[in-house]
Amino acid sequence: MQLKNITGTITLLTGTIIGTQGYIEIGGNDNPTVRNPLTNEVYIPGSSIKGKMRSLLEWQLLGYDEIAKNKGNVHACNKPDCPVCRIFGRSAGKELDETSGPTRLIVRDAFLTDKSRENLKKLKQVKGFDTEIKYENNINRLTSEAKPRNSERIPAGVDFEFSMSYKVIDDKDKQNFDKVLDALRLVELDGIGGGVSRGNGQVKFEIKVDGEKIDVQNRNI
């Protein structure tokens, strides 16, 4: 078995909502930013990154009909060569084919770079907080009544260090690694966190694979 190490930075190009509820619904309760309970620093959970990578890759590889047939649930099948299941894993407890082996991709939490940590400390000293509040309104089409809400966002320009590891057990895994890079590019084209369709969560990846710089922006998606 070979392990590929993916390391690098995630740069927030727009304010990003990484909330404790996992998504934002206009008119709902405020969704505070996820923080390390020991340091109170913002971070991006590995599950948020991996979940978005998987979701977008499912749309690309499986298409609407397959996703609709599964009623929008996470894809899991008994095909040993299914790239989605091999890369991201299958749900525990399902009676599925075991020949594909363990989950190949491990995605770890992404933490602030030293520079961004200092920048947010300075922001908190000046403004009293290290995040920003974005105000939104849901307008009733008949009465024009506005229902305001606010969302806490990590500001644009903040960088996070991230790391992933990918198990290569056979030749199929070598082929599927390109799909991991495709998934990262898809996240760049879409976004991460809540309210992506309303301008939140645009990101850029700078990555190295086993120490070699890889430009995912040039991938043909």
How does the language model describe each region?
Residues 1-132, 147-221:
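RNA-binding basic/glycine-rich loop and surface signature characteristic of RAMP-family CRISPR effectors
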Residues 136-149:
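Short amphipathic beta-strand starts and helix->beta connectors
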